[in-house]
């Protein structure tokens, strides 16, 4: 058995010197540490509410941190995980922290979060080399570069408290479909101690509990009695078969809930006095913004040990003494000043009188120095989850048709599924945002777990309390099997036997039949059978995924819909004749599907490597188990054991599992319950091409750049028409295009295959587009077989650029015609994604594009580009220069503005540059749909920054970046957001828009966004607030009205 000390030696090079010393001290002085921790816990819990964790980041046993490291090391060896790649914004994307910014700011010597796949190499090094590494790291720490020059924001401190964020739940506990369960440990480590026991939202089973499981009785008993009346309709087994032999999922801290009823007062906690929503809650403040500025000064010592001295500084910077004491940064602040706790408020036991410093007396250099303390970054996980909250609350909007509101429920559920599949395992391993933030790390994981469970609470409350009754009011009924008449049951039984029964495959689990492999996000039925007096068998049945989830009963006058699982559960006797069915319940599993693509640089065929990795995903670790409320505890325990899951991975749901399948309801032929259909229009400059045969799309582009705003203008009449014209034009000699995602029945792929017979066609297909890997591999094979030159891009980088080039022979020689877009070449999503694309034949852009394609296909070395900005080459540095130029103009008293539209913002260098520009006086407006880690509106730092988020019937997917440039505006469109992964781990393209009319159009688009009455405004503590009074009509409606006026011709096939 490997001891703790031996394990520490094995992973010696994974931690810096300070952390190693802490681990060794913890191992050698457990008794002393435990005593100290116990005292800390006792003190800090005075400010905590019952059942919640303490706010203090140091609460908990120190030995638990060492235990976490050992446990995490063990899991990482069993399951290598890719900690660099993430799924994309087209799939509600996520990515990780800017983990290597620390290394970049310290000349490449910064300490990164360890990748478990690198441990074998590191363990092979000699102990002497390890010692020299530690000395080198220590030296580099002492010679950290000037933080003002580096402009790097580092991750540190505990800005967000798990306890406080739990309070943001807007669910009425007495009426919520999910109820709390207490966990005694995290990550399967019993030694984590009682300080880590927390209350998380987990629902109570409805089935009748045994008498000895009921703690006190009246409320639980009455609730369970009420539940019995609905047991059969919910697929429960007969009461006589379960009452005495099977244990329900115990009565937990709250009585079970039989039915979720509409609650008129449900929304009150998320509505302020002006009746507008605030996410996560009106009553909750994530950050103590009033004290944040002074707190930044107080905590500079936690992150900066440098010799920087400003000429305008009052006093000296913090310097840490050997005893841990500090010297003041500014005169008047003593080393005994109050230290803020985890959520930015002042620890109750440390409250003292503090001398505040007027903001006007704090010089700009001090403000910039404070930024390196990194408490100005909103938490990455919370930012993503609050984005899900904003999507979810669109389902509240009473002005939306009911089926569109149901669609937002499905979108939120789908996003949450992807979150678990991409992030959950990484969180469990402890590699995301934990090493440099909350300690012990369990607190951070608990916070995210509580937030996801609260979000699930919200999803089911909105669906069951609000939307389901409203669907019924609109004659759309989602019924249960027990609601059917006998003739309808007979008819559905015939339907089942003819269309479903042949697809069913019961799989028993016994000595001769191992536990079956479960596919990701599959819905399954757990059945317990009894063949004779002594033998019981567990059988798993997968609900077929190739048949609809909902069945429409057309005999009824209204829309009556029954879930497929209800039909299967009611007809299980046809699968098990002459067998007694003891219990039947539903469960759904989620697997980690972001495994590392190992050996990419050594693979002979990337296509075959992708196929191998896709196969491995079918056996990836489980990360979540959702079960129906009526599942017996014995079955649940068996599933947890077989799937290697713990209690906090289980979600017991009092409602339908897999709400993302509600997308099927949105396809019902009920136009009066949906948005009025929008038919895209033809760009006015392309309307006359059909009337005048001498005209073609290339002659239109030669007259000037063409900017197309999708989906208001037609993708088919612009982008698709451009490619198809190139295929048919005999003067076109070559077509080159990069495809990241496209639709399954792509006309574009067919056109390229046709062109390959008589033209040079080069197609770059990114095989690593998350979620579309399998489809892209099929397209790659199809294109190769048609004669196209197919490339898979650069090793180690995704090719996310959306670019196409047509080479045409003309009188003056060859000319390149280009299309550069912010969105994919996907006709299916082009109708619902808001994107911008540019058509141009600029010679400089053409030369740049030729060089770029040669770089992508032939690894040719390109020293520079004339106009194009390419990530990871020069895009980030150019953006920082553009931001710094605005800051310089503002300091000189000139007008300076930055307007940007994007999907997400988390790159620390860009955030830091924006903070400094704000301090300089630049007016900054950011339209960020999703994750945003900048904090706007903080006096003296970001008061010139405004952040809004727009959600609506179309998904805002554009990337537009505009800079005032002293009255000579510079405008760009790009495939990249201001996310670290886009700027460092992908091939992205940003192109300048030169035409004055097009620049004006981009500014008009941004102006419409800023006046959107449906926008969410980001508050300075990270929450979002819905605008209370309409400034103007919502932006998407205004774009549709403008399109009707400027481009009156509607596209038709």
UniProtKB/Swiss-Prot annotation:
Keyword terms, alphabetized: ATP-binding, Cell cycle, Cell division, Kinase, Nucleotide-binding, Phagocytosis, Phosphoprotein, Sporulation, Transferase
InterPro entries xrefs: PP_kinase (IPR003414), PP_kinase_C_1 (IPR041108), PP_kinase_middle (IPR024953), PP_kinase_middle_dom_sf (IPR036830), PPK_C_dom2 (IPR025200), PPK_N_dom (IPR025198), PPK_N_dom_sf (IPR036832)
Residues forming the catalytic site: 800
Enzyme class label: transferase
Pfam families noted in UniProt: PP_kinase, PP_kinase_C, PP_kinase_C_1, PP_kinase_N
Subcellular location: Vesicle
Composition-biased stretches (Acidic residues): 81-102
The keyword Nucleotide-binding is annotated on this UniProt entry: yes
The protein's Enzyme Commission number: 2.7.4.1
Dependence of activity on temperature: Optimum temperature is 37 degrees Celsius.
An example Gene Ontology molecular-function term: polyphosphate kinase activity
Biased composition (Low complexity): 32-50, 215-239
Broad class of the protein's primary localization: other
Reaction catalyzed: [phosphate](n) + ATP = [phosphate](n+1) + ADP
Cellular component per GO, a single term: polyphosphate kinase complex
GO biological process, alphabetically ordered: mitotic cytokinesis; negative regulation of asexual reproduction; phagocytosis; polyphosphate biosynthetic process; polyphosphate metabolic process; sorocarp morphogenesis; spore germination; sporulation resulting in formation of a cellular spore
Composition skew (Polar residues), residue ranges: 143-155, 1036-1046
Region (Disordered): 23-155, 200-245, 302-328, 1027-1053
Family the UniProt entry places it in: Belongs to the polyphosphate kinase 1 (PPK1) family.
Function statement: Catalyzes the reversible transfer of the terminal phosphate of ATP to form a long-chain polyphosphate (polyP). Produces polyP in a broad range of chain lengths (50-300 Pi residues). Involved in development (growth and fruiting body formation), sporulation, phagocytosis, cell division and the late stages of cytokinesis.
HAMAP family: Polyphosphate_kinase (MF_00347)
Quaternary structure, from the entry: Hexamer. May form higher oligomeric structures in the presence of ATP.
Protein's UniProt name: Polyphosphate kinase
Species this chain originates from: Dictyostelium discoideum
Source lineage: Eukaryota, Amoebozoa, Evosea, Eumycetozoa, Dictyostelia
Gene: ppkA
